[in-house]
């Protein structure tokens, strides 16, 4: 770390601070976003539920009032998929729904496709990436998973917070700094 400057940076740590990534609050605004079904805000949150029902319908999920857990990620060990995979069935034993959007290691793609086949109407494994669907997921989910092993900063937690979706993340890197 620090490109050979670790010692100098540590000795000056009292007067240094990191600069976080950021998101465009104009483009990522639940009050104006062109990708979502119904606009909403903290003052008028009822549109979030309408987005959830629309997403459930679009993805073939049962239209129910249960927690909708989402994950938008690259399917790789760094993103904590290897930590999550062994507990997916335990998670699904609860009355929840799960939506995944992302691609990556073929073994993890298979894991999520298999999960979807075991829990029809409750799991939607979308093994691709689509910006419009990502926005709809951020605007619709109740909880957003980010089990990353390391994350220099991360953006998913910022998008989820912007759209009123509670992030659940490992305490690491930028996730610890922004949640």
How would you describe each model-predicted region?
Residues 1-179:
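Catalytic cores of nucleotide-sugar-dependent glycosyltransferases that transfer UDP/GDP/TDP-activated
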């Amino acid at each position: 770390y620090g490109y050979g400057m670790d010692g100098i940076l540590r000795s000056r740590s009292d007067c240094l601070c990191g600069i976080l990534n950021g998101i465009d609050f104009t483009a990522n605004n639940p009050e104006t976003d062109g990708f979502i079904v119904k606009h909403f805000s903290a003052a008028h949150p009822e549109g979030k539920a309408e987005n959830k029902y629309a997403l459930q319908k679009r993805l073939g999920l049962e239209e129910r009032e249960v927690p909708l857990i989402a994950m938008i990620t690259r399917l790789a060990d760094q993103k904590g998929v290897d930590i999550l995979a062994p507990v997916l069935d335990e998670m699904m034993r609860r009355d929840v729904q799960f939506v995944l959007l992302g691609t990556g290691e073929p073994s993890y793609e298979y894991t999520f496709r298999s999960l979807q086949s075991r829990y029809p109407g409750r799991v939607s494994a979308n093994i691709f990436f689509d910006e419009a669907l990502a926005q709809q997921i951020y605007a619709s989910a109740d909880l957003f998973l980010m089990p990353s092993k390391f994350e220099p900063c991360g953006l998913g937690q910022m998008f989820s917070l912007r759209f009123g979706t509670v992030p659940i993340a490992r305490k690491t890197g930028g996730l610890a700094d922004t949640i």
